[in-house]
């Protein structure tokens, strides 16, 4: 059965991931509604990357269940990934190709490719489109990956710390323009980020991971109303001061 009848794009139930004796995720449950901007927060090592790997069908859990559009991504990865755009934490592309060449290559592989839309986003991010990927800054590489991830009009966009290495102008473009634009169009966005101030006004729902467990999972507005504090202060109060967000 197609997952299109479900109200959730992503549903996670009691998900546990282990690496040897180390437990990376411990009975994690969450649900990402269609059209929502969902923020997953946590310190480095909290388990965010493990959850994303499961979501993308790259990691098989030790226990529990994860469904994407109603299907198991581990068993249905090719079909599901055609509906998903991904921006990894570490940008990766053929080093000798420019952004223009990468977009052209993607266009030859995907009939739904919006080359004009990709070019416009690269212009917004002020990326030199004829410069080889290996010569771009880390922030520029991330901007290229974001523009390419949106090129086929995905139903779900997965962003793994998309503003890391970006300057203020580019961060504002990612949060204010790209994520806001996608939310207005009804695209579901699943984002991990260290930029809590940037995501606070855009996320509909938020989960906080600590030690592989979900310690907060609720609507952003309800969370802020309950605590009567900014998101950064709530995060620190929940997980403590030590380490990077």
Predicted segments with their positions:
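Catalytic Walker B motif of ABC-type/P-loop ATPase nucleotide-binding domains
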Residues: 157-161
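ABC ATPase "signature
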Residues: 217-218
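A short, surface-exposed alpha-helical micro-motif characterized by mixed small hydrophobic
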Residues: 199-201
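Conserved ABC transporter NBD signature motif
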Residues: 64-72, 79-80
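Helix-to-loop junction immediately C-terminal to a conserved catalytic motif
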Residues: 56
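Conserved signature/switch motifs of ABC ATPase nucleotide-binding domains
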Residues: 151-152
